[in-house]
Amino acid sequence: MTIIFVDNEEYNVDKSDNLLQACLSSGINIPYFCWHPVLGSIGSCRQCAVTIYKDLEDKVGQLVMSCMTSVLDGMIVSTSDKISRNFRKGIIELLMLNHPHDCPICEEGGSCHLQDMTVMAGHTVRRYRFTKRTHKNQYLGHFITHEMNRCISCYRCVRYYKDYSGGTDLGVFGISNNVYFGRYNDGCLESEFSGNLVEVCPTGVFTDKTYSKKYSRKWDMQYAPSICQHCCVGCNISVGEKYGKISRIENRYHNAINHYFLCDLGRFSYDYSNVDERLTYSIYRSQNKTKIINDVNKTIDKLAMKFKKSSKIIGIGSCRASVESNFSLQKLVGSENFYLGISQKEYDCLMLIKDILKDNQIHVPTLREIEKSDVIFLLGEDVTKTSPLIALSIRQSIKGQVKTQDVSKNIPIWHADAVKNSFRNNKNKLFITNLMNSSLDDIADESYYASTFDQVLLGAEVYKCISNNCISNVTLLKQDLLSCAKRIATALTLSKCPLIISGSHSYNLDLIKVSFNIAKSLKVIGKNVGLILLSSNVNSIGVSLLEGISIEKVINKVLLKQIDKIIVLENDLYRYLPESIVDTLFKSSSCTVVIDHLNTRTLKQADIAIPTCNSFESSGTVVNYEGRAQRFFKTYHPNSSENKKSILESWKWLHLLYCKLHKISVFWHSLDDVIEEISLKIFSFSKLKDVAPNSSFKIFGQKLARSHHRASGRTALYSNINIHEPRPPQDNDTMFSFSMEGCQNVQNYLPYVPFSWFPGWNSVQSWNTYKKINNENYGKHLFQDTTKFVLTYYKLNCKNVNKIEDLYLIVPCYFLFCNNELAQYSPVIQENVLKNAYGIINTEDAKVLLIESGSKIEFSYLNKNFSIKVQLSKEFKKGQLGLPLGMADFPFFLAEKQVKVFRKISI
């Protein structure tokens, strides 16, 4: 820390920051455009000018760009002198010459960095009266709208898209006063992180197309801090709602996880919550008759009547449901009758990952810690598709050597161009094994495309080279692969911070075991090694701690007639099991109850279908790949709009039924009560109470406001339905209020900020004005530290699938949207992405089958026909058929099954 003097005030600032960042984090307003805390400084916009003085005797000073100026001890700075004020005012006037001044029709209006900076710089009178330069806008896909006339040429978009996220299809064209930011032609942006352009751009050039369809100004929406539900990373998000519909998703800063960015899956896939087909009342089906029950008490009475004298009840949980909801189901049916709702293959992988996390011998890095790794070995996980923010962090880790070299070269880390030049010939190492090419191949030192079995063999040889301990037969490897394994092992042993990444998406236990063995052997030789094992869902780790049973084991109970009633919690069984088996399961049950917010095929087959809240309408806890428990909070109350709905959180439905069956009074009155019982009864969740403050938490005697203090029209939202002013819903589960009434001063409680705002800063750039944000410990790591280091390794089976001639082995292939259950119910994904889904087949196999790229093929398994378009790949191993398992009509049970492709379908 060092002391500087700004406008005659003394400030303690971080010496590693540039002057602009030091001032912003101290609460001093300086307008800027091209600087970004992650992208660094290039000094192109010239907007952040300030005056610095040599000493107290200096009356003239020197005009400098604060983003390009290092902080010096005792520095004297003025932001309010006449010269710098006039300079900044003149610069923003020049930037605005060709701007259309279309704020009233711009989606960024009210949340626009350009608006904030224009006001801050004092540019209030427009003097330019001549023809403005205009551009033709481009079609950039179904997520982002392009309005090039609003551009001020700050270069942030291309610096983020190309330099940071590694995109190649967006650039800058033209020269001088006529530059154009876009693609070389119209088309969908290819990057999995293109949505961040919406927040990176300080104007309205790139706007959220999904938000435009249900647009509301920022101050008229209701927000809540939440957790992205689409993968196991657990990114922090802010969810905005108006009129009972989710309007947009914004990034919520977390120092250890997502930082300033989200992936497109997390940002644009929220519309599953808004679909009209969603169930909002209970349905009872009996003897081909359907009865609607739009009352909570009547629904519980009907359930109790059905379950009254039954002892053969099973509960099937879900990895997309919260810890609290799964625990409530387990409490209702008993631990011995609780099923996790996942396949046996995934169950085995998940239990192994859980054991490794509990063992806690190898550190599990956060996303920010990934960026500090100097050698990464990625085994069998296409992380760009399964956990995209992991891939983004891997890209930054390749630049990690610069961060250790810049000190010796006297290059400040915020100096973007200097750091970029220093990095050109110095990068960290990345080694990849995968079924086929991936989006990270462009930065990989070596990529090995092979079957999962061959990837395990390569991993085993790497382990052998590191530890000189042969745990399996690897003589099947060719000489060139032995050399590859030695190169990988050498790089890992010479590294300071190696990282091994694998996971459950290949459904292969040996892949996880060999990843652990490699990491363990590196730790034995003194390396600061990290190990990341990814799972398939947002709460896979959390559910695994409840010690349930795999879904396949239900089949045995069906055969033994040990099932009378079934409760399915937020799960679609048709995604995991063959259709015939699920149908048999339902027929064997005298009553099947399904609780879900998605209109799944399982819900449609239920005898009693019960609507429940999704993550935007409920509060609860999920556990990410680190074992970090995080709380998400409801954004709005689903029963408070003009439509009468009977929707409760899943845990409330289950608890009401439990109390009714046991003839006792309700004793879980809020989420705090559920968490209290979980903490007491399950040791792994003993820290659950510490994840976030309870519902009684207040600041200055007030709950935290979900709405902006400028929110307008609250009492008139539904005046066309009812002229009487309704009371705002009361939230007994969290520390937030459903209103603008409440504490808005939450700067000291940043992990729980519903939306980003700071006086004078209405856009998401307000995050940059807070003091050093350190919410790294937000959430709670559930796994205790081990005190004894036990040297144990896993023994590999190394058994290949017994391949049958002329049959194709089905392997899971992953795509950003197609495999995700929630995304598949989002209309924008259904209309634009799912219809173009495809499988993968080897080029040589395609010649034998007489098919070409884009052809549609058909195959059969268990008397059910499947069809899909296919793309050809040279890297994909012969004899395999890659399918987007988890997508509708392609259940997970197909993994590692062998099928015969028996015909090509004409399209």
Swiss-Prot record:
Group of enzyme by EC: translocase
Keyword set, alphabetical order: 2Fe-2S, 4Fe-4S, Iron, Iron-sulfur, Metal-binding, NAD, Quinone, Translocase
Gene Ontology CC entries for this record: membrane
GO BP: any one term: ATP synthesis coupled electron transport
Cysteines engaged in disulfide bonds, as pairs: none
Residues that hold [4Fe-4S] cluster 2 according to the record: C151, C154, C157, C201
Single GO MF descriptor: NADH dehydrogenase (ubiquinone) activity
UniProt xrefs under PROSITE patterns: 2FE2S_FER_2, 4FE4S_HC3, 4FE4S_MOW_BIS_MGD, COMPLEX1_75K_1, COMPLEX1_75K_2, COMPLEX1_75K_3
Ligand binding ([4Fe-4S] cluster 1): H99, C103, C106, C112
InterPro entries: 2Fe-2S_ferredoxin-like_sf, 2Fe-2S_ferredoxin-type, Mopterin_OxRdtase, Mopterin_OxRdtase_4Fe-4S_dom, NADH_UbQ_OxRdtase_75kDa_su_CS, NADH_UbQ_OxRdtase_ferredoxin, NADH_UbQ_OxRdtase_Gsu, NADH_UbQ_OxRdtase_Gsu_4Fe4S-bd
Function: NDH-1 shuttles electrons from NADH, via FMN and iron-sulfur (Fe-S) centers, to quinones in the respiratory chain. Couples the redox reaction to proton translocation (for every two electrons transferred, four hydrogen ions are translocated across the cytoplasmic membrane), and thus conserves the redox energy in a proton gradient.
Name this polypeptide is given: NADH-quinone oxidoreductase subunit G
Species of the source: Buchnera aphidicola subsp. Baizongia pistaciae (strain Bp)
Gene for this chain: nuoG
